Swiss-Prot record:
Encoding gene per record: RBCS
Gene Ontology CC terms, in alphabetical order: chloroplast
Keyword Coiled coil carried by entry: no
Family: Belongs to the RuBisCO small chain family.
Protein name per UniProt: Ribulose bisphosphate carboxylase small subunit, chloroplastic
GO biological process: photorespiration; reductive pentose-phosphate cycle
Protein's organism: Musa acuminata (Banana)
Length: 180
């Protein structure tokens, strides 16, 4: 049985194909940091940076205590009528459908239960129907004024709804009652 087994001690040699000869060896290990050129300047000289010629004036952030935050643009002061009309024009230019909502509290609240529900202030009451086909920002502003007269102690917000994507794209407070 041993005589029938033949063991070859000759080494086999295969010739490398052209595709194998141009292959790059895989990366193994980390290279030393001393091999990389130094890119940092040794001193902390800031004179090469551009300057506007004056001190930097930073805008103060909204206070975190005693002032409620609302929705988009809530960190800004209350909008004047001209700014409100410009926001509505942007909404209409974007081909969104304006919709007005109002709520007496304006915040999320829970009275009878700790878990979230329908009556916890997340859902506001719609003022009339969405303004399908509206192309005039002044018409939307008139609706805000009409809602103010009807509900002077309620928050009023304007929503821009995209009926193609079926999503609400913008929402901002148009009116806050006195004291907020």
């Amino acid at each position: 049985m041993v005589s029938s087994m033949m063991v070859s001690s000759a080494a086999t040699f295969t010739r490398a194909s052209p595709a194998q000869s141009s292959m790059v060896a895989p990366f193994t290990g980390l290279k030393s940091a001393s091999a990389f050129p130094v890119t940092r300047k040794p001193n902390a000289d800031l004179s090469h940076l551009p300057s506007n010629g004056g001190r930097v004036q930073c805008m103060k952030v909204w206070p975190i205590e005693g002032v409620k935050k609302f929705e988009t643009l809530s960190y800004l002061p209350t909008m004047k009528d001209e700014a409100l009309v410009k926001q509505i024009e942007y909404l209409l230019r974007s081909k969104w459908i304006p919709c007005l909502e109002f709520c007496p509290k304006g915040f999320v609240w829970r009275e009878n239960h700790r878990s979230p529900g329908y009556y916890d202030g997340r859902y506001w009451t719609m003022w009339k129907l969405p303004m399908f086909g509206c192309t005039d920002a002044v018409q939307v502003a008139k609706e805000v004024e009409e809602c103010k007269k009807e509900y002077p102690h309620a928050f009023i917000r304007i929503i821009g709804f995209d009926n193609n994507r079926q999503v609400q794209c913008i929402s901002f407070i148009a009116y806050k009652p006195t004291g907020y």
